[in-house]
């Protein structure tokens, strides 16, 4: 399946989440492919959210999908500004 990488985010463990063909591809900090979180549409971009920062929101072709995970997103300094 064809497709291009667009969105990219990291979790608190250093895993990398990248939108691509068939959904969100997950890689370990060492670069090992851990799996794909399937999406019903072409995945375009993504961001962390939710009260505990453990939900991944993915903007697809015509919808936004939310995936609850067992890991939190990596909070970078600019996300904690008030």
Predicted regions and their residues:
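Beta-rich, blade/repeat-based domains predominating
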Residues: 1-21, 40-54, 61
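WD40 beta-propeller blade core
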Residues: 25-26, 65
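Short loop/turn segments that connect beta-strands within beta-propeller blades
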Residues: 27-32, 70-72
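Blade-level signature of beta-propeller repeat domains, shared across WD40, Kelch, NHL, RCC1
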Residues: 45-82
């Amino acid at each position: 399946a064809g497709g291009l990488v667009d969105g990219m985010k990291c979790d608190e463990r250093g895993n990398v989440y990248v939108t691509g063909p068939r959904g969100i591809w997950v890689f370990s900090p060492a670069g090992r492919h851990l799996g794909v979180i399937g999406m019903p549409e072409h995945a375009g971009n993504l961001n962390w959210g939710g009260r505990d920062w453990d939900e991944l929101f993915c903007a697809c072709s015509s919808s936004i999908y939310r995936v609850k995970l067992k890991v939190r997103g990596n909070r970078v300094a600019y996300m904690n500004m008030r």
